[in-house]
Amino acid sequence: MLGEAMLRVGNVRDEAAMESVRDALDRLGVDYEHVRSEPEDDRFPQTAYFYVPDDSAEDVEWALADLSREYGFDAEVL
């Protein structure tokens, strides 16, 4: 999507971990959209995909780097 980047968060182990990603994005104040999860929304571990604004991509990467160390995520803005 124009003006948006894709955030990929791999190795999400449970719903609490997924909520920590959403909470981090909320704290940044970015307008994000959960696009999909693989394999499915209710199965774990999973990889979650979010659209985030291009102009927030660097802040999102920094925030997710901290969470990645804590939760073992494999997160990157594509």
Regions flagged by a language model, labelled:
Residues M1-V12, Q46-A48:
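Short glycine-/aliphatic-rich beta-strand segments at the starts of folded cytosolic domains
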Residues R8-A17, P53-D55:
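Short, surface-exposed ligand-recognition loops at beta-strand->loop->(often short) alpha-helix junctions
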Residues A17-P39:
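Short, flexible N-terminal segments of the mature chain
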Residues D31-R36, S68-L78:
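Conserved short beta-strand edge segments in small beta-sheet-based binding/regulatory domains
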Residues E33-D66:
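Short, intrinsically disordered low-complexity segments
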